[in-house]
């Protein structure tokens, strides 16, 4: 079969270039309707007709059956040529794919925007592994809050962005795939008055002193919406872009609360703070996003696929 395909490639290169082979196959696939084929190929109908005539005259062979001047089917030679042409096109596409996969897709620069907290909680093992496996790729990691990252993605300042669902960007503009799911939880000092409760209600948080992420983080906006929705109005005494500062603040101040993703409690065990789940919690869903494009670079496709693969559940 490989020999047959190679011979077909040689015949195809000599008799028709790959572009003309695609034209020929498209004519057959469109039931010999030149008008429809030309529209699908974005070429003029006269150009298609001329290509057919020139080919048959040059090779002194008829590949199309005709009736009243119209193409109605394939001759025996045409059927063989159609079969060979499809093999050649497939082989050509495979060759191009393998060429770039084996070389260019693993070289270059890729910029990924990841919120600092997500970087620690979700990407701490995935990203170093990916970087070590691809030494010829220059990874630029932008640590920015997810809310600010939305603009970076839309302005083409990052190739990929890790955001939180709901991103509130039209699905016509971005591709978004969930890679991690958890919830937000309350973090507090063991000496806080709420420390004795095993589960916290939103009413418990009303008028409590609280430190939260600043407005560049989507968690900030999700929390503000949750407070409003649950008629809960805590006393926000400070906001910050540093999750470790928020955690340290509650460890050293028994009157202060903060709300962070639940995985932080699993990653950083300490007797200096407690973690309590919240009744009807705010979901914390991490998504891998990219702008919708007609064509992506091989490097963009490669890294996007590798990240999705890393977070795919193992069977």
From Swiss-Prot:
Pfam (any one): HTH_1
Has the keyword Iron been applied to this entry?
no
What positions does the domain HTH lysR-type occupy?
16-74
Please report the organism this UniProt entry assigns to the protein.
Haemophilus influenzae (strain ATCC 51907 / DSM 11121 / KW20 / Rd)
According to the entry, DNA is bound by residues in: 34-53
Concerning Gene3D superfamilies, the annotation shows: 3.40.190.290, Winged helix-like DNA-binding domain superfamily/Winged helix DNA-binding domain
Asked whether the UniProt record includes Cell inner membrane among its keywords, one would answer no
| Protein name, per record | Uncharacterized HTH-type transcriptional regulator HI_0775
Q: Which UniProt keywords apply?
A: DNA-binding, Transcription, Transcription regulation
